[in-house]
Design a protein with these regions (language model features):
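Structured alpha/beta or helical-core interaction and ligand-binding surfaces enriched in interleaved
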Residues: 1-150
Length: 150
């Protein structure tokens, strides 16, 4: 079980892979940091087969990155813009993968929408920083969906 950010659409979404020279992470267990070099193209978008658990969109890719950078966010915004050429919207989800069925209540889904011409890097940063376990006393998850429209 872990957190996941994925993009979903009614049109196929292309997979994206980082250049092969970015195959390593520097992990410092003493201070709890991870460094992947910070290159703007050091992320992947891989087909996400479990999207049906969260959305009715037919196609999805999961974002795989060590952490947010503005340069990566700009590249993802360009990717979403390209996806909007063949679909009216792209959903961006931040969810907890698996295990939410163990709790008494279904997760709360928080939804928001933004037009692509108003979509900015901070929207991606904020989505990634959302707290999925923001109601700890009830042990109830929150999922977040930001719909980007043309």
């Amino acid at each position: 079980m872990s957190a996941c950010i994925f993009f979903a659409s009614d049109a196929p979404l292309l997979e994206v892979f980082p250049p092969p020279e970015y195959d390593c992470l520097a992990i410092n267990a003493d201070d709890g940091t991870i460094d992947d070099g910070g290159a703007d193209d050091n992320f992947a978008l891989r087909t996400y087969p479990d999207s049906f658990l969260y959305t009715d969109k037919a196609f999805a890719v999961c974002l795989d990155w060590a952490y947010y950078t503005e340069g990566r966010a700009r590249q993802l915004i360009d990717y979403i813009g390209s996806a909007l050429e063949s679909a009216p919207c792209v959903e961006l989800w931040h969810v907890w993968q698996g295990g939410f069925y163990l709790f008494e209540e279904r997760p709360v889904v928080h939804r928001a929408a933004v037009r692509f011409d108003e979509f900015v890097e901070d929207d991606l940063r904020e989505l990634g920083e959302t707290d999925l376990w923001n109601n700890k006393e009830a042990n109830r998850l929150s999922f977040y969906c930001l719909t980007v429209t043309r």
